[in-house]
UniProtKB/Swiss-Prot annotation:
Belongs to the IlvD/Edd family. Its cofactor is [2Fe-2S] cluster; Mg(2+). Functions in the biosynthesis of branched-chain amino acids. Catalyzes the dehydration of (2R,3R)-2,3-dihydroxy-3-methylpentanoate (2,3-dihydroxy-3-methylvalerate) into 2-oxo-3-methylpentanoate (2-oxo-3-methylvalerate) and of (2R)-2,3-dihydroxy-3-methylbutanoate (2,3-dihydroxyisovalerate) into 2-oxo-3-methylbutanoate (2-oxoisovalerate), the penultimate precursor to L-isoleucine and L-valine, respectively. Homodimer. The keyword Iron applies. Its EC number is 4.2.1.9. Keywords: 2Fe-2S, Amino-acid biosynthesis, Branched-chain amino acid biosynthesis, Iron, Iron-sulfur, Lyase, Magnesium, Metal-binding. This is Dihydroxy-acid dehydratase.
Length: 557
């Protein structure tokens, strides 16, 4: 039986003789035209350590495709380094790159009639970009995560990239020496691989195991390790089998599968960005999914992993403790996962987990039993109120001060807010408001890791609130609320906040409230005028014109 169900449209018949001529130039032989064409979306880049170690994985996948008697076709996908662009105008391109990556993969796979695709990526937006594409085109596909970085070390302390961001605040506050500042800077990122805590890259890749679109254990492997290369090869072999079975992404990505993925995100203390990305993935798969679904799952799934940014350990520690399959097995046994969901292997979640222990190992402190959960409910909460009629997202577990009411300190750009924090103009009890940074206003919903890390570095992480219509890095923690919708640029209430207004953030009541009476707000709204777009040409202008609100995933189509 021939498995070139799609590629035959470009390789078979008299009319396709010129097409075959071009394939011969690539080294194809006549019998290759009866084999499936397998795309390998290559995210390798020397822009960032997250992607600098991907070529070995791509090479392994290509070899495995050949060994499986199929034709590999590599093509490139771009990446933006969130960590390197953070705090600059370049960060506005980060979320945009999610859409660009999805469009690149769709364009190549559909334009070349590929029969399947192995997507290989590393930095934050690579994962949702790739999964959006797979859900959208519904061609057999698998995601290969590039793997995590190993932790850095300085004077006996484990480091991640967030350590370097927080060091900026500590150093400017006089709480860190020049030697330690430079020591953290030079040692925070010791290897290739994506940022090491349960930040956005590890959050999304971990969830893909539960979604059924990546192989078990693959998300917590370190990029430099041989097992990561071996996993990439196995992923390619599994993908070729999926092509033969005609097992497609939408056979796997169902509403129940997304519930599984989000349950793992809650259990591991994952990134707020996952809310935005799963709204987008569900949209691409044409699945009914809303921010209320996250809140529904939060209320029933506990946090059972002690992982950075709010915890102690990193992804390599989680891997040694049993990885995501151990987390999934605990959730499955507690009735918190759908065991009948299909995976890319052709087996169900329950079948995949049958040999995983029901109890985590006693010699580790990363994964806790359900009855010893760190928090009885999930950490990613949807807040609402007159400041966020359409919702906002916050991490609410582990807060020493879960309720804050304080004066608004209003900034219409990130740089002026960061300067105020570093210049000690922000005091305990303040609520920093960062606005005009949403999907349309930013544009691109840049992440606010620089100001939030500076607040923590200044020792104000438990006493200062921060709200924004932009996003937060997966490395952010503290009393911070993002994804405020409607955003300021379209006239959301956040646009009406004035310096000194009283704002309440209440993690118990899931409330985000501007304490100004309705009559005054109506007066301000009548006087408000939409600002001119920050960009009128180029990709940011295109994104601003097409982007939907944050509570709809900030998608463009």
């Amino acid at each position: 039986m021939s498995y070139n169900r799609r590629s035959k449209n470009i390789t078979q018949g008299v009319a396709r003789s010129p097409n075959r001529s071009m394939y011969y130039a690539l080294g194809y032989q006549k019998d290759d035209f009866d084999k499936p064409m397998i795309g390998v979306a290559n995210g390798h880049s020397t822009i960032t350590p997250c992607n600098a170690g991907l070529q070995r994985l791509v090479d392994a996948a290509v070899s495995a495709v050949k060994q499986a008697d199929a034709n590999p076709q590599t093509f490139g996908t771009p990446t933006i380094s969130d960590g390197m662009s953070m705090g600059t105008e370049g960060m506005k391109y980060s979320l945009v790159s999610r859409e660009v990556i999805a469009d690149c993969i769709e364009t190549c796979v559909q334009g070349q009639w590929m029969d399947g695709v192995v997507v290989v990526g590393g930095c934050d937006k690579n994962m949702p970009g790739g999964m959006i594409a797979l859900a959208r085109i519904n061609v057999p596909g698998i995601y290969v995560y590039g793997g995590t970085i190993r932790p850095g070390h300085w004077k006996g302390k484990d480091l991640t990239i967030v350590s370097a961001f927080e060091a900026v605040g500590e150093f400017t506050a006089g709480r860190m020496s020049q030697e330690d500042f430079e020591g953290v800077e030079k040692n925070a990122c010791p290897t290739t691989g994506s940022c090491g805590g349960m930040y956005t890259a590890n959050t999304m890749s971990s969830s893909f195991e539960a979604l059924g679109m990546s192989l078990l254990y693959s998300s917590t492997m370190a990029n430099p390790d041989q097992e990561k290369v071996d996993s990439a090869a196995e992923s390619a072999r599994v993908l070729v089998e999926a092509v033969k079975k005609d097992l497609k992404p939408r056979d796997i990505i169902t509403k129940q599968a997304i519930e599984n993925a989000v349950s793992v995100i809650m259990a591991t203390g994952g990134s707020t960005n996952a809310v935005l990305h799963y709204l987008a993935i569900a949209h691409a798969a044409e699945i009914d999914w809303s921010i209320e679904d996250f809140e529904r799952i939060r209320k029933r799934v506990p946090v059972i992993c002690d992982l950075k940014p709010s915890g102690q350990y990193v992804a390599t520690d989680l891997h040694a403790a049993g990885g995501i399959p151990q987390v999934m097995k605990l959730l499955l046994d507690a009735g918190l996962l759908h065991g009948d969901c299909m995976t890319i292997t052709g087996r169900t979640i329950a079948e995949e987990l049958k040999d995983v222990p029901s109890v985590p190992r006693a010699d580790q402190k990363v994964i806790y039993p359900i009855d010893q959960a760190l928090y009885k409910e999930g950490h990613l909460a949807i807040l609402k109120g007159n400041l966020a009629e359409d919702g906002a997202v916050a991490k609410i577990t582990g807060l020493k001060n879960p309720v804050i009411t304080g004066p608004a300190r209003v900034f219409d750009d990130e740089q002026s807010a960061l300067a105020a924090i570093l210049d000690d103009k922000i005091r305990a009890g303040d609520v920093v408001v960062l606005r005009y940074l949403g999907p349309q206003g930013g544009p691109g919903m840049p992440e606010m890791l620089a100001p939030t890390s500076a607040i923590i570095g200044k020792g104000l992480g438990e006493s200062v609130g921060l709200i924004t219509d932009g996003r937060f890095s997966g490395g952010t923690w503290g009393m911070v609320v993002g994804h405020v919708a409607p955003e300021a640029f379209v006239g959301g209430t956040i646009a009406l906040v004035q310096e000194g207004d009283s704002i309440t953030i209440d993690a118990h009541k899931l409330l985000l409230q501007l304490n100004v009476d309705d009559a005054e707000l109506a007066r301000r709204r009548a006087a408000w005028k939409q600002p001119a777009p920050r960009y009128t040409r180029g990709v940011l202008a295109k994104y601003a014109a097409l982007a939907r609100p944050a509570n709809k995933g900030a998608v463009t189509g």
